[in-house]
Amino acid sequence: MDPRTLSALKDAIRSIPDYPKPGIVFRDITTLLGDPGAFRRAVDALVHPFAGGRIDQVAGIEARGFILGGAVAHQLSSGFVPIRKKGKLPHTTVSIAYALEYGTDEMEIHSDAVKPGDRVVLVDDLIATGGTAKAAVDLLRQIGAEVVAACFVIDLPELGGAAKLRALDVPVWTLVEFEGH
């Protein structure tokens, strides 16, 4: 993607200082989602590396990963798999606990969400430390998926999440980087 388009995408993301706590700059993609041109360019850029290839499913992490992942799945003519917080899926699930900055959380996926060997792309809005994304990759692999790549609109490279996924042999595709937290 050309640098001007990437710059425009970055400009479409609102930065909110000291949210949710002092010292954190929250990267708010709702402004990008609300701009039809920016939203389309972001989805097109997330789809680009996989166009023409076989992607069976796109998995999105709750909640913004649902918005982006659904759009990516549509463009790739793939199915969509939601990865949700524990207790939100109605059928038989597989769950995983993962570490947060303060404490732990759990996410889950339907146990039959993919067929063994399905080629899956994981999508979310942002990668920071990589804890949530790593848990999602682990869940997908646990139910038999081949995780082809993980895609994010935003990377916070100082926090090392993308590197953590690459160490698991998961290629990472991001659109824009922001410094800091």
From Swiss-Prot:
Top EC group:
transferase
- According to the UniProt entry, where is the signal peptide? none
Give the reactions, separated by semicolons, that this protein catalyses.
Answer: AMP + diphosphate = 5-phospho-alpha-D-ribose 1-diphosphate + adenine
Pathway(s) annotated for this protein in UniProt = Purine metabolism; AMP biosynthesis via salvage pathway; AMP from adenine: step 1/1
Keyword Kinase included in the entry's annotation = no
Molecular-function GO terms, alphabetical: adenine binding; adenine phosphoribosyltransferase activity; AMP binding
- E.C. code: 2.4.2.7
Which GO BP terms apply?
adenine salvage; AMP salvage; purine ribonucleoside salvage
Q: Where in the cell is it found?
A: Cytoplasm
Can the keyword Cytoplasm be found in this entry's annotation? Answer: yes
Pfam families in the cross-refs: Pribosyltran
**Which keywords appear in this protein's UniProt record, sorted alphabetically?**
Cytoplasm, Glycosyltransferase, Purine salvage, Transferase
Stretches that traverse the bilayer:
none
The family line of this record is: Belongs to the purine/pyrimidine phosphoribosyltransferase family.
Assigned GO CC terms = cytoplasm
Protein's recorded name: Adenine phosphoribosyltransferase
What is the purpose of this protein?
Catalyzes a salvage reaction resulting in the formation of AMP, that is energically less costly than de novo synthesis.
InterPro entries, alphabetized: Ade_phspho_trans, PRibTrfase_dom, PRTase-like, UPRTase/APRTase
